[in-house]
Amino acid sequence: MEKAKSQSLEEDFEGQASHTGPKGVINDWRKFKLESEDSDSVAHSKKEILRQMSSPQSRDDKDSKERFSRKMSVQEYELIHKDKEDENCLRKYRRQCMQDMHQKLSFGPRYGFVYELESGEQFLETIEKEQKITTIVVHIYEDGIKGCDALNSSLICLAAEYPMVKFCKIKASNTGAGDRFSSDVLPTLLVYKGGELLSNFISVTEQLAEEFFTGDVESFLNEYGLLPEKEMHVLEQTNMEEDME
């Protein structure tokens, strides 16, 4: 049973540790567990305790039986305490794996604000030369057009919340294709990744409420799967689930 439990624990974490192969995951778990334990406080093995508990005792030796019962109570307590220590150690290991995973996923370019593009050439350069893993959201606007200022303000907030996404804005008159972006199609949102256009939303404010806020724009983009998950959301959710257990 101990072997089956160990195998189950090892399989649960396959692919989450810093090593990718099954042997690497098993070694990660064993190393983490050994580092977390105090060798002086290791309890008796479960197999030995079960063997002792199932051993026949003389009914005539009442004192010996009572002493044995008291001994088993202590050992049972130590066994339960050991199980709790293993569970806590397992939770710490899971949390460390999640932190390592998020650190790796978060590695890459970070932005955090809205870039003002000054020309069509700069616009094309941004789309073509940015890293392929980066999502680029471009707001094409013009001063005095309803909804453009509000959308710019919302994108400033989203840029801070999603630093791995590159948010840009450019005036329609600066794109070199002003005839394609007349006032009746503004504000327009273009979303790119890897040099490819993912989505094109013209007159985007018509799909929002008359008065919209950052959360409305975020929900709109999430409906189309255009925003990545916020950086520590999964880790925080995992921690909450562990605290509830």
UniProtKB/Swiss-Prot annotation:
Annotated Phosducin domain residues: 1-244
Ranges in coiled-coil conformation: none
PTM comment: Light-induced changes in cyclic nucleotide levels modulate the phosphorylation of this protein by cAMP kinase.
Biological process, per Gene Ontology: regulation of G protein-coupled receptor signaling pathway; visual perception
Main location: cytoplasm
Record-listed Phosphoserine modification sites: S73
Pfam families: Phosducin
CDD domains linked to this entry: Phd_like_Phd (cd02987)
Keyword Nucleus assigned: yes
Keywords associated with the record: Cell projection, Cilium, Cytoplasm, Nucleus, Phosphoprotein, Sensory transduction, Vision
Cellular compartments annotated: Cytoplasm, Cytosol; Nucleus; Cell projection, Cilium, Photoreceptor outer segment; Photoreceptor inner segment
Gene Ontology CC, one term: photoreceptor inner segment
Region (Disordered): 1-70
Organism superkingdom: Eukaryota
Compositional bias of kind Basic and acidic residues: 28-50, 58-69
Free-text function comment from the UniProt entry: Inhibits the transcriptional activation activity of the cone-rod homeobox CRX. May participate in the regulation of visual phototransduction or in the integration of photoreceptor metabolism.
Subunit description: Interacts with CRX. Forms a complex with the beta and gamma subunits of the GTP-binding protein, transducin.
Family affiliation: Belongs to the phosducin family.
Protein name: Phosducin
Organism for this UniProt entry: Bos taurus (Bovine)
